[in-house]
């Protein structure tokens, strides 16, 4: 019995001595530092648990817009402002809601004695609910001012006339009304119209076919001349017209010299030169046809170049002058009445009520119906002049929408 007991005591003594020696060999400062860190962390953990579990829950702030606050949002709002600490900049989740509260007067400030924090001392800053309500009121006022300014700008933009080419207002320059068009395509800037004429090569409106009243002031300095953009087809047309003109001049000059010169008498008697005369005559006819065919295109290109390299002044549309010009044109062309009678049928109702367009400008002017007859006469003369207008490509009746889009997209 004594031997096992002695062995057990011997084993216990050896273990104690071994642990003691290990404690002597281990670095004491490092072990003490680890123990101190562990104690500090445990103490901080217990303090945090005491703060979050043993404190009383704060009262939920009343909503400013009068609607009951959702339970999820009220459950999240559990951290009040803690004076000048790290929680003073925290805002409740009520500000994140998508709805904007209506502007209401801010609540009266609380007395200093009633504003206390959870630890019994006076708070140094107002609660988070007051700060959030003030910020929401400022945000609502700013939104209201922005909406008012946007509405006023839209209203003023709808009343302000715009250029039908660049879609800018009078701040970019003086707006003119150079043709009969009305509505949103009535006004345009003078530089925009000159640039449009230089790109299109036509000096009349493509909607109402009214020829712009443009006065040439002066030509620019040759050092300031600008080149216009040409397509491949336009370049070929210009080259063909120039080469055809040069060949025609040279050929006609040689034919005239060989026909009337005494020194070329032997050429006129030679068979080979007689064949050349026939070939040159045929080539001259071809060149004349080429020049006639490409002449209008080259003339439009020249007018485009002239619009860019000359200073112009565009006049506004004068309705009275336009009507006078149409009446004068109707008097100088009396044969237009017969052509309109063949193209436009008349009816008994038009004859009884208003003068028909085919009755001629003299009868329309003497009819007692007044301004209506003048309008009929004006539109009839305009229609006739548009048919008699030379070297102008007429668009089909269904292409008016395309023309409007071309005007508005430049």
Swiss-Prot record:
Membrane topology, from the record: Multi-pass membrane protein
Matching SMART domains: RINGv (SM00744)
Transmembrane regions listed in the UniProt entry: 238-258, 272-292
Catalytic activity: S-ubiquitinyl-[E2 ubiquitin-conjugating enzyme]-L-cysteine + [acceptor protein]-L-lysine = [E2 ubiquitin-conjugating enzyme]-L-cysteine + N(6)-ubiquitinyl-[acceptor protein]-L-lysine
Cellular-component GO terms for this entry: Golgi membrane; Golgi stack; trans-Golgi network
InterPro entries: MARCHF4/9/11 (IPR046356), MARCHF4_RING_CH-C4HC3 (IPR047905), Znf_RING-CH (IPR011016), Znf_RING/FYVE/PHD (IPR013083)
Alphabetically ordered keywords of this record: Golgi apparatus, Membrane, Metal-binding, Signal, Transferase, Transmembrane, Transmembrane helix, Ubl conjugation pathway, Zinc, Zinc-finger
Amino acids binding Zn(2+) 1: 163, 166, 189, 192
GO molecular function terms listed in the Swiss-Prot or TrEMBL record: ubiquitin-protein transferase activity; zinc ion binding
Subcellular location(s) of the protein: Golgi apparatus membrane
Pathway per the UniProt entry: Protein modification; protein ubiquitination
Chief location of this protein within or outside the cell: Golgi
Compositional bias per record (Low complexity), positions renumbered to this chain: 126-136, 352-366
UniProt cross-references to Pfam families, sorted A to Z: RINGv (PF12906)
Biased composition (Polar residues): 333-346
Gene Ontology terms: biological process: protein ubiquitination
RING-CH-type zinc finger span: 155-215
UniProt keyword Chaperone present: no
Residue numbers spanned by region Disordered: 92-136, 324-372, 390-410
Sequence positions that bind Zn(2+) 2: 179, 181, 205, 208
Protein EC: 2.3.2.27
Compositionally biased spans, kind Pro residues: 100-112
Tissue distribution: Expressed in brain and placenta.
Its biological purpose: E3 ubiquitin-protein ligase that may mediate ubiquitination of MHC-I and CD4, and promote their subsequent endocytosis and sorting to lysosomes via multivesicular bodies. E3 ubiquitin ligases accept ubiquitin from an E2 ubiquitin-conjugating enzyme in the form of a thioester and then directly transfer the ubiquitin to targeted substrates.
Domain remark in the UniProt entry: The RING-CH-type zinc finger domain is required for E3 ligase activity.
Name listed for the protein in its UniProt record: E3 ubiquitin-protein ligase MARCHF4
Source organism of the structure: Homo sapiens
Gene for this chain: MARCHF4
């Amino acid at each position: 019995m004594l031997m096992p007991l002695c062995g057990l005591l011997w084993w216990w003594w050896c273990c104690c001595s071994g642990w003691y020696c290990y404690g002597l060999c281990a670095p004491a400062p490092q072990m003490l530092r680890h123990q101190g860190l562990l104690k500090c962390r445990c103490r901080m953990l217990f303090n945090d648990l005491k703060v979050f579990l043993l404190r009383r829950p704060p009262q939920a702030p009343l909503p400013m817009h009068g609607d009951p606050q959702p339970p999820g949002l009220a459950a999240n709002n559990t951290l009040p402002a803690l004076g000048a600490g790290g929680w003073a900049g925290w805002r409740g989740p009520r500000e994140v809601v998508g709805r904007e509260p209506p502007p209401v007067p801010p609540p009266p400030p609380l007395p200093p004695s009633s504003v206390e924090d959870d630890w019994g001392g006076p708070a140094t800053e107002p609660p988070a609910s007051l700060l959030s309500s003030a910020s929401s009121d400022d945000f609502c006022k700013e939104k209201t001012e922005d909406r008012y300014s946007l509405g006023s700008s839209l209203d003023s933009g709808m009343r302000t006339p715009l250029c039908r080419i660049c879609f800018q207002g009078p701040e970019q320059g003086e707006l003119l009304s150079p043709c009969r068009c009305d509505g949103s395509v009535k006004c345009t800037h003078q530089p925009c119209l000159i640039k449009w004429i230089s790109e299109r090569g036509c000096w009349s409106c493509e909607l109402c076919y009214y020829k712009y009243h443009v006065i040439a002031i002066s030509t620019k300095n040759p050092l300031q001349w600008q080149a216009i953009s040409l397509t491949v087809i336009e370049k070929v047309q210009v080259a063909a017209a120039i080469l055809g003109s040069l060949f025609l001049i040279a050929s006609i000059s040689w034919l005239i010299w060989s026909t009337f010169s005494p020194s070329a008498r032997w050429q006129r008697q030679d068979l080979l030169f007689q064949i050349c005369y026939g070939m040159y005559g045929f080539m001259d006819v071809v060149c004349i046809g080429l020049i006639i065919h490409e002449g209008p295109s080259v003339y439009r290109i020249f007018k485009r170049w002239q619009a860019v390299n000359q200073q112009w002044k565009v006049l506004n549309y004068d309705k009275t002058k336009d009507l006078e010009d149409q009446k004068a044109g109707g008097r100088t062309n009396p044969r237009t009445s017969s052509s309109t009678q063949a193209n436009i049928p008349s009816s008994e109702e038009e004859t009884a009520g208003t003068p028909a367009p085919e009755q001629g400008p003299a009868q329309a002017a003497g009819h007692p119906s007044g301004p209506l007859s003048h309008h009929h006469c004006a539109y009839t003369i305009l229609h006739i002049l548009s048919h008699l207008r030379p070297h102008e490509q007429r668009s089909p009746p269904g292409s008016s929408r395309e023309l409007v889009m071309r005007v508005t997209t430049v």
